[in-house]
Amino acid sequence: MATTATMATSGSARKRLLKEEDMTKVEFETSEEVDVTPTFDTMGLREDLLRGIYAYGFEKPSAIQQRAIKQIIKGRDVIAQSQSGTGKTATFSISVLQCLDIQVRETQALILAPTRELAVQIQKGLLALGDYMNVQCHACIGGTNVGEDIRKLDYGQHVVAGTPGRVFDMIRRRSLRTRAIKMLVLDEADEMLNKGFKEQIYDVYRYLPPATQVVLISATLPHEILEMTNKFMTDPIRILVKRDELTLEGIKQFFVAVEREEWKFDTLCDLYDTLTITQAVIFCNTKRKVDWLTEKMREANFTVSSMHGDMPQKERESIMKEFRSGASRVLISTDVWARGLDVPQVSLIINYDLPNNRELYIHRIGRSGRYGRKGVAINFVKNDDIRILRDIEQYYSTQIDEMPMNVADLI
């Protein structure tokens, strides 16, 4: 077991400056034994997996992939912290696929994610990367037919990705057998280990074989989460990014001062006219606000789509499909969208409401400049929000300036 003291020591950690196009000036504070593997070819991956990786469009591993994949494949417990858009999902997906015995038709890896959408995205990514391996992978998520889950699991799945509640339900019903599980992956661990999911994760963990390897991946890892990892990780390797480097480079952040809540809507309409947007996401803090704003925008003849956690699964899926394809250009959403959902064309994020906690800020704005693409984030700030904005600035050691008149030129 690693102790908290070991976690905190910088003696066993060194800082590395990476000089890569899209990862300039990101300082890793990383365990000594982590080395860099610059190409997929030199990672010792199976041939059919390499084919899948190149067919998927990957050419060169990202900074996190160069460090984490080999460690995970070696069987080490790993805490990997990487910003949104750096390829962290592919990091554990490639590692999981490498470790499977395809001949054995039993669940060998379990991936937990905080939202249904993210679980489905992970499943699709695994199937695409494992295209030449004949891998079976099922997304086990709430809001879908339990009978279908049971049928799929009975058929035999090498990997199960899912939300903690439904996964635990399937384990309890003995539909998801855990005896062959070798690896547990917690994606977006900061969100997962927040109060809501902590108990469910422990419930699932108790059913896993004692030697199960644990991999924890997230954009932010607050101190209290590192403390919790002590409970179920053994001597984990750390691959961490310093917190104050976490705001993505290439994303310009601005604020617009709106004295009162009522003024936000007009501000949004004014912006909408100014910006010939490729694709944008507008974040609100509540489902009710998402519905209200969507209706109001449509009344004003703006075309928008919207999504939040109360919508039926099918509806959310078709909205995401529409948005990904570019058929809808502006999406109004709650934080359900902020977690790891991958739409490369998004170049503008508007925080209609500042997020309720500062950890969420990076998940939201990390959307808009994926894989080193440029992006713009605009925060609507009421008089009594100034304090929250300053807190976010301080927390991420970043600067958020007042929005200039020529903001359209920056997108």
Curated annotation (Swiss-Prot):
Its EC number is 3.6.4.13. The modification N6-acetyllysine is found at K124, K198, K296, K321. It holds the Pfam family Helicase_C. Keywords: Acetylation, ATP-binding, Cytoplasm, Disease variant, Helicase, Hydrolase, Isopeptide bond, mRNA processing, mRNA splicing, mRNA transport, Nonsense-mediated mRNA decay, Nucleotide-binding, Nucleus, Phosphoprotein, RNA-binding, rRNA processing, Spliceosome, Translation regulation, Transport, Ubl conjugation. A motif (DEAD box) lies at residues 187-190. It is found in: Nucleus; Nucleus speckle; Cytoplasm. GO terms for cellular component: catalytic step 2 spliceosome; cytoplasm; cytosol; dendrite; exon-exon junction complex; glutamatergic synapse; membrane; neuronal cell body. The keyword DNA damage does not apply. Changing K88A: ATPase activity is not increased by the presence of CASC3. Does not prevent EJC formation. Prevents the EJC disassembly. It is linked to Richieri-Costa-Pereira syndrome: A syndrome characterized by a unique pattern of anomalies consisting of microstomia, micrognathia, abnormal fusion of mandible, cleft palate/Robin sequence, absence of central lower incisors, minor ears anomalies, hypoplastic first ray, abnormal tibiae, hypoplastic halluces, and clubfeet. Learning disability is also a common finding. ATP-dependent RNA helicase. Involved in pre-mRNA splicing as component of the spliceosome. Core component of the splicing-dependent multiprotein exon junction complex (EJC) deposited at splice junctions on mRNAs. The EJC is a dynamic structure consisting of core proteins and several peripheral nuclear and cytoplasmic associated factors that join the complex only transiently either during EJC assembly or during subsequent mRNA metabolism. Belongs to the DEAD box helicase family. eIF4A subfamily. This is Eukaryotic initiation factor 4A-III. It comes from Homo sapiens.
